[in-house]
Amino acid sequence: DLHGSAYYCRQLLDCFALEGAERLILLGDLLYHGPRNDLPRDYAPKEVISLLNKMKDRLFCVRGNCDTEVDQMVLDFPIMADYAVFPVEDRLMYVTHGHVFNLDNLPPIQPGDLLLHGHTHVPSWRPFGQQNVYLNPGSVSIPKEGSLRGYMTLEGTLFRWCDLAGTEYHRAALEDLTPWP
């Protein structure tokens, strides 16, 4: 959830480059801060548009509750899907913002599938259902409940949560079903 912060968008893109990642998955709420959030640092949606459009071929995004058709008109990559599905080893990961599909209203997951969403701005990892796992990277711009500004990476079956200095503060492999926090 960037929420229009050019400052944190730049920091996230720096982390993306530092990690040497192939793709950046954004979980919605790209340009607007919404009526329930204070303005994030360096609120500059036009600059965020420019920064993201420059790397459109490496982005994958889903729609957040603050994203609209107007946002899609200025962005050069699709953002309006409610969810997407990615393979993670022998499982499927449902990627969504969290306002439509979440633990209380699941997408069409099967036993063993993963649910990744933002929206709450609180990092999390926990098992549910039949060998399913819920993941949340937290937020780079407006973290909540005392959490750090940060991002999450995936390599193989290992998920890492890092702060914006690139320092890992949590990791979990799909084989590990220990809840956190």
Describe the residue ranges of each PLM region.
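Active-site metal-binding loops of divalent metal-dependent hydrolases
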Residues: D1-G4, D29-L30, G64-D67, G98-V100, ...
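Short catalytic-loop micro-motif centered on adjacent basic/acidic residues
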Residues: C61, Y94-V95
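Hydrophobic positions in the central parallel beta-sheet of the AAA+
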Residues: L24-L26, Y94, L115
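Conserved beta-sheet core of the metallophosphoesterase superfamily
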Residues: L92, H99-L164, H170
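Catalytic phosphate/metal-binding cores of nucleic-acid and nucleotide-processing enzymes, i.e., regions
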Residues: L13-A17, D76, L164, R171-A173, ...
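Short, well-ordered secondary-structure micro-motifs
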Residues: P35-D38, D71-L75, A81, L106, ...
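Surface-exposed loop/turn and secondary-structure junction residues enriched for glycine/proline
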Residues: S5, H33, E89, F128, ...
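Core catalytic region of metal-dependent phosphoesterases/phosphodiesterases
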Residues: G4-V88
